[in-house]
A protein has these predicted regions:
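Extreme N-terminal segment that seeds HTH/winged-HTH DNA-binding domains in transcriptional regulators
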Residues: 1-34, 83-114
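Short beta-strand(s) of the beta-wing in winged-helix/HTH DNA-binding folds
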Residues: 30, 60, 65-66
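A short alpha-helical element within helix-turn-helix/winged-helix DNA-binding domains
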Residues: 34-45
Length: 114
């Protein structure tokens, strides 16, 4: 299920993109799962069709979705193991950085120090 948080500073297309990415990577959305049409999801979320189309397009470019005349489906991707997701959550909760970019910068520095 996709939800849009109007208080979130991120644009709606990015919220859709991130939620679908998480669902695909966690295995909640299995390979071959057909997603709602752009118009259907836009109507359900009360968004412009172009907003949903942009999210789908970016997910397709990321290799997570494939579209054809019969619709948009989840591609086969290797899910991120539950242990890795749990470790990431613990890191996010404990690191005390302000943004994803800050967290990535910290990881890059520490990765280089290995």
């Amino acid at each position: 299920m996709i939800t849009i948080d109007e208080r979130d500073a991120r644009p709606p297309f990015e919220q859709i993109r991130e939620q679908l990415t998480d669902q695909i990577r966690s295995g909640s959305l299995a390979a071959g799962t057909r997603l709602p049409s752009v118009r259907q999801l836009a109507g359900d979320l009360r968004l412009a069709a172009g907003t949903v189309a942009r999210a789908y397009s970016e997910l397709e470019a990321d290799g997570l979705l494939e579209s054809n005349r019969s619709g948009t489906r989840v591609r086969e991707v290797e899910p991120i193991p539950a242990e890795a997701r749990e470790a990431a959550r613990a890191y996010i909760d404990g690191v005390g950085v302000g943004s994803l970019d800050d967290a990535i910068r910290v990881l890059r520095v520490e990765w280089g120090n290995r």
